[in-house]
């Protein structure tokens, strides 16, 4: 009985550790690291928010000026529901995208995205090179709009 309970507990812990956010990180050559990448599953034509954390390891402030993806008709930078032209990426600082705050919005998914799928999104910076990130698709959240 104890072995079965232990095996069930261990399985639950391992499954929890394999959640929908990416533990991998992507980094530009000049030091902007992107990690904690997550986005929910969705049907074709729906919109989905992409959340992540950006850490600028450099000594100069930069700006995220755009994003693109072949997985959606339109990709926008947003703060809440408002479109923004830039998101500051301050030097030696980490910035976390959150629901109802800054995020990347994928509008009009071109195909249904299931839990476990992965898409690519290109982040465009004012002063750094573009960064292509791999986005794991997880469970949809109540914050999708």
Task: Pin down the residues of each PLM region.
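Bacterial N-terminal signal peptides that target proteins for export
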Residues: 1-6
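Compact, glycine-rich, soluble single-domain proteins
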Residues: 19-145
């Amino acid at each position: 009985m104890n072995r079965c309970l232990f095996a069930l507990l261990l399985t639950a812990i391992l499954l929890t550790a394999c959640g929908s956010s990416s533990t991998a990180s992507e980094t530009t050559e000049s030091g902007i690291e992107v990690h904690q990448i997550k986005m929910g599953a969705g049907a074709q034509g729906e919109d989905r928010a992409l959340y992540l954390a950006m850490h600028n390891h450099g000594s100069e402030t930069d700006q995220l000026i755009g994003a693109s993806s072949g997985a959606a008709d339109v990709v926008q930078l947003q703060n809440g529901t408002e479109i923004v032209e830039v998101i500051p990426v301050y030097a030696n600082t980490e910035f976390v995208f959150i629901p109802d705050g800054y995020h990347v919005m994928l509008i009009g998914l071109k195909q249904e995205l299931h839990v476990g799928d992965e898409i690519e999104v290109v982040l465009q910076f004012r002063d750094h090179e573009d960064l292509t990130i791999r986005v794991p698709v997880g469970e949809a959240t109540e914050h999708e709009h």
